[in-house]
Amino acid sequence: DGAQFWTPYGATECLPVAVIEGRELQSTRNATEQGAGTCVGRAVAPNLVRIIGIDDAAIAQWSDDRMVADGVVGEITVAGPTATDSYFNRDAATHAAKIREVLADGSERIVHRMGDVGYFDAEGRLWFCGRKTQRVETASGPLYTEQVEPVFNTHPDVKRTALVGVGMPGQQRPVLCYELQPGVPESRRTEVVEALRAIASRNTHMAAIDAFLCHPAFPVDIRHNAKIGREKLAVWAAR
């Protein structure tokens, strides 16, 4: 009973960024299933984790004016000894993901853009809301995968879901793709869709989701089965 299990959050370019103990993670599960995102814990010192407004363009120079308030979803950035300064022989990638910051003493450091979106809660915990490139930009505002999919994943007949956008950013139609659990007959698809539609109607920020498509097997990263190929699913959903 006294054992502790810590789960890190990070990336190849910076690991770890934050950590969370198993019991705390379990205690946040209800919030995750209600659309809060996934709590990944507190930043690992001496890393400095800050949230900036979402911007798809490169950012050459750091400015504190870009930072957003606690509770506001933005892009996660990290500065610290575990963050890389550049990509080897990949200048375009370095330009897109690295920000140069001038400190008060005149020295400089590199800030890494995680490419993930999230926010800090009132307790200083970091919440992961998905990949920046996989957000869905609707006419009524953005939807983030990790604030949507876990809510629908609570349906017992659903194995997993994937939120994708069809159309131009700013006017995208949100589409929820889903896989049925093994053994669930195809004849239940209509019933499942009605249940998913009811879930959407109970959550204000998901009310715009009115398209539900059953997919036989999501495309995934061959290295990480949990990484769903939402870009490929979006092409499929648009057909």
Segments predicted by a language model, with ranges:
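Active-site glycine-centered loops adjacent to acidic/histidine catalytic or metal-binding residues
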Residues: 10, 41, 116
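Residue-level recognition of short loop/turn positions
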Residues: 48, 55-56, 64, 103, ...
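Generic structural signal for well-ordered beta-strand positions
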Residues: 59, 68, 121, 127, ...
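Conserved ATP/PPi-binding loop(s) of AMP-dependent carboxylate-activating enzymes
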Residues: 42-46, 54-102, 141-143
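Conserved C-terminal "lid"/linker of ANL adenylate-forming enzymes
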Residues: 162-167, 175-176, 197-239
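Short Gly/Pro-enriched turn/cap motifs at secondary-structure boundaries
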Residues: 34-43, 66-67, 108-110
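AMP-binding/adenylate-forming catalytic core of the ANL superfamily
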Residues: 80, 85-86, 95-96, 102-205
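Gly/Ser/Thr-rich phosphate-binding loop
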Residues: 1-35, 48
